[in-house]
């Protein structure tokens, strides 16, 4: 690499590149010293040769004066974070190298203390539960969420989403908080759901600012909205803020759909409009929380990728995301035209015409084509908020609304066997991410595979299409689809998944923080699934992905939750190759079957808590 090429790079990345290509004589960490340690063995040489010298030469210590300490926010590292803040319209940005799970916990730990009230989106990722409810002794007021048929995660329900209702709930729980202008210290919201619904940030900022000091938008599954004109009001960081508005924090998983290495994340802070107010979160307080959660031995190329992401988006963000938006639309159109059982999740007809009959240019600029309220009847959901759109950069395909019902896990495995990796799948949905680097060749390969699965695989033996399964299914692929669907129907799996998130069915026994303390202290009992109803959970229980808590720590296990996880248990035993992963439940082998158990508060401990 010559000097002219390096000059085109942003400062931190340019310095790291210079460092990596110069001969070094390190006596500091990391101990592999540019790969020299590995190269002492045959296996190590294979390792370094495959990954290339740059990967090892770029792994340097923060003892190096040229590059400095990335956690200090000074020098070249500070310049990189400042570039990101300018690019994404933040007052200040923190680079986080351990994922948005850590970013969320940093923000919650900086803002919340014992006794606070928090408005809490029930769709939040488990890291929000951990940071807000398990680590901080706060009281949540949950916001109702939507589940569509097929297990598809919608946004917030319009039910109960009124200031008066939320203020009344705060008064019921903590009357003393009503003396404050804002009864809630923080609102924790998902800007974009895993299944591709994105919230109108402007609406939620206006709605919740009279109630909350701060709003934390988890934008792990977004980050590009400010570069797409269609989503102009959906970016929390580009909205004009008044002194009456809440302070804004936004966390982004740069590695998901932006241009970052795995684990890269960033926190954006925008609150200069309340800097002289009592509720203001000083940068030093957030930085203190940041330093509690990060490593003092960062991998510098991760930091560099965050700077490069900011650089690329500052120069060409809108152009690049126009390309991704166009790709997402064209790919959906082709799937609609060539597939019969697998179809994109879309509103359907617009003004009496099929969605795919419109010009791509129209679809790119008109929100009617992404309005998911039009799907309410078809998808079996009520109380849909008008303040969400289908995310145009997430291609969510349904597998239960076409000619034949197909379990999405079966389709996912088929595609992965052909080196096509979906982001995730639910019961009847499968997600593909649209990004600026995607090509028509990739889309064509995907569409061909989808079409082949529908037309050429159903009558083939399972062992021919899926030769590496853990057990033998002596049937055709079509018959296997029918068998799995029968299991789903027998357990009313779709209805159970929807009911799992109805708030009226949930009862809190103790706080999440207290549940965690009991779990750590040994005040716990491992109980089989069938005996869980009415017991207080000590761990958050969920299916993963997406990592949304079905039962939160401190809540009582309901009959619905027990029935839902009983279905998952049966799924694991009947079709182990296709069953989802459980988190917060523990598998034991009993008489040749897998049984689910969960940690709960012992009954004697419950009596003691009541007496106190």
Model-predicted segments: where are they?
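Non-catalytic terminal extensions of PLP-dependent enzymes
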Residues: 1-58, 65-66, 74, 86, ...
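Short, composition-biased local secondary-structure segments
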Residues: 44-55, 96-108, 166-178, 380-384, ...
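Conserved N-terminal alpha-helix of the aminotransferase class I/II PLP-enzyme fold
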Residues: 55-102
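Generic alpha-helix structural propensity
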Residues: 71-79, 102-103, 301, 326, ...
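Conserved PLP-enzyme active-site core in the AAT-like
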Residues: 86, 100-113, 117-336
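Short, well-ordered loop/turn elements at secondary-structure boundaries
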Residues: 89-91, 113-114, 183, 201-202, ...
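General small-molecule cofactor/ligand-binding pocket signal
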Residues: 94, 141-143, 423
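Short glycine-rich or small-residue beta-strand-to-loop segments that form or flank ligand, phosphate
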Residues: 94-96, 187-190, 430-435
């Amino acid at each position: 690499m010559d000097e002219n090429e390096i000059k085109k790079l942003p400062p931190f990345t340019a310095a790291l590149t210079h460092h990596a290509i110069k001969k070094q004589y390190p006596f500091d960490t990391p101990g592999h010293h540019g790969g020299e340690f590995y190269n002492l063995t045959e296996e190590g040489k294979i390792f370094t040769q495959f990954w290339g010298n740059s990967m090892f030469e770029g792994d340097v210590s923060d003892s190096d004066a040229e590059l400095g300490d990335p956690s200090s926010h000074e020098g070249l590292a500070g310049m990189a974070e400042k570039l990101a803040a300018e690019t994404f319209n933040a007052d200040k940005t923190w680079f986080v190298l351990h994922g948005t799970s850590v970013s969320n916990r940093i923000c919650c730990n900086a803002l919340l203390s014992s006794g606070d009230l928090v408005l809490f989106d029930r769709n939040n990722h488990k890291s929000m539960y951990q940071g807000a409810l398990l680590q901080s002794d706060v009281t949540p007021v949950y916001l109702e969420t939507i589940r569509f048929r097929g297990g598809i995660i919608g946004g917030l329900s319009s039910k109960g989403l009124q200031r008066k209702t939320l203020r009344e709930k705060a008064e019921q729980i903590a009357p003393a908080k009503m003396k404050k202008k804002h009864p809630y210290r923080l609102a924790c919201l998902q800007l974009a759901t895993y299944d591709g619904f994105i919230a109108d940030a402007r609406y939620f900022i206006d709605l919740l600012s009279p109630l909350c000091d701060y709003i934390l938008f988890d934008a792990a599954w977004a980050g590009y909205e400010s570069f797409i004109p269609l989503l102009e009001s959906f970016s929390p960081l580009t909205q004009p803020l008044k002194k009456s508005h809440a302070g804004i924090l936004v966390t982004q998983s740069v590695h998901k759909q932006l241009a970052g290495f795995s684990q890269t994340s960033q926190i954006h802070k925008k609150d200069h409009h309340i800097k002289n107010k009592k509720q203001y979160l000083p940068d030093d307080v957030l930085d203190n929380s940041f330093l509690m959660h990060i490593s003092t031995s960062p991998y510098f190329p991760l930091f560099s990728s965050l700077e490069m992401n900011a650089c690329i988006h500052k120069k060409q963000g809108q152009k690049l995301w126009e390309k991704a938006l166009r790709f997402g639309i064209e790919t959906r159109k082709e799937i609609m035209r060539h597939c019969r059982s697998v179809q994109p999740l879309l509103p359907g007809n617009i003004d009496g015409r099929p969605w795919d009959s419109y010009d791509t240019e129209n679809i790119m600029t008109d929100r009617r084509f992404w309005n998911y309220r039009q799907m309410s009847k078809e998808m079996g959901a009520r109380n849909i908020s008008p303040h969400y759109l289908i995310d145009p950069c997430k291609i969510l395909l349904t597998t239960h609304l076409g000619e034949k019902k197909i379990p999405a896990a079966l389709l996912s495995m088929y595609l992965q066997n052909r080196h096509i990796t979906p982001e995730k799948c639910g019961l009847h949905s499968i997600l593909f991410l649209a990004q600026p680097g995607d090509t028509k060749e990739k889309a064509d390969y995907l569409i061909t595979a989808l079409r082949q699965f529908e037309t050429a695989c159903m009558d083939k033996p399972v062992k021919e299409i899926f030769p590496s399964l853990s057990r033998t299914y002596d049937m055709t692929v079509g018959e296997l689809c029918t068998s799995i669907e029968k299991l789903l129907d027998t357990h009313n799996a779709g209805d159970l998944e929807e009911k799992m998130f109805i708030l009226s069915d949930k009862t809190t026994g103790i706080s999440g923080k207290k549940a965690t303390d009991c779990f750590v202290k040994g005040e716990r009992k491992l109980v089989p699934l069938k005996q869980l109803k009415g017991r207080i959970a000590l761990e958050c229980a969920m299916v993963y992905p997406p990592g949304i808590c079905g039962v939160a720590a401190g809540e009582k296990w309901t009959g619905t939750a027990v029935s839902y996880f009983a279905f998952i248990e049966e799924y694991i035993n009947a079709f182990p190759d296709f069953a989802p992963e459980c988190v917060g439940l523990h598998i034991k082998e009993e008489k040749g079957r897998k049984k689910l158990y969960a940690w709960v508060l012992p009954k004697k401990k419950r009596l003691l808590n009541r007496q106190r």
